[in-house]
Amino acid sequence: MQIREIHFCEVCGSPYVELHHVVYRSENKNLENCKLNFVYLCQEHHRGTYGVHGSKGARLNRKLKLEFQNKLEELLDKQYLTREEINNILQIDDKALNRLLKRFSIQDYKYIKEDIIRACMDGKLIM
């Protein structure tokens, strides 16, 4: 018998949740299966008026994206990282990782931290 993980809404703590991709799949399909890109939200905070997909949800969407960006800043703890180090953090399949990194030049088999974060954020860093 497998024990199921219990998740709660990141905003209000409700136990009735839906999986949300912080960086939308339409923005960056490469992170579709990256657990760092997942948050759990109740129906109201996911699809409600003030939810991330709602007509007045821009503030919450921006907040979650900034938290994701900050998490990447923290986990990508060196200025230059190898492909393996990046994959250990993002834990995405090889094909997705190749697509994510293909447009960047490497120096001594390493990628620049800011380039990686920018790629994960669909080219838009939150300031």
Residue spans for each PLM region:
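Short linker/helix segments within small regulatory modules
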Residues: V23-F38
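Short Lys/Arg-enriched helix C-cap and helix-to-coil transition segments
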Residues: K102-M127
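Helix-turn-helix DNA-binding helix
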Residues: L97-N98
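Short, amphipathic alpha-helical "recognition" segments used to contact nucleic acids or chromatin
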Residues: K63-L81
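Short, charged surface segments at domain edges that flank catalytic/cofactor-binding sites
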Residues: M1-F8, N30-E32, N70-L72
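Short alpha-helical "recognition helix" segments of helix-turn-helix
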Residues: E84-L90
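Short cysteine-rich loop/turn motifs with clustered Cys
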Residues: M1-E18, V39-E44
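Short Cys/His-centered divalent metal-binding micro-motifs
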Residues: N37-R62
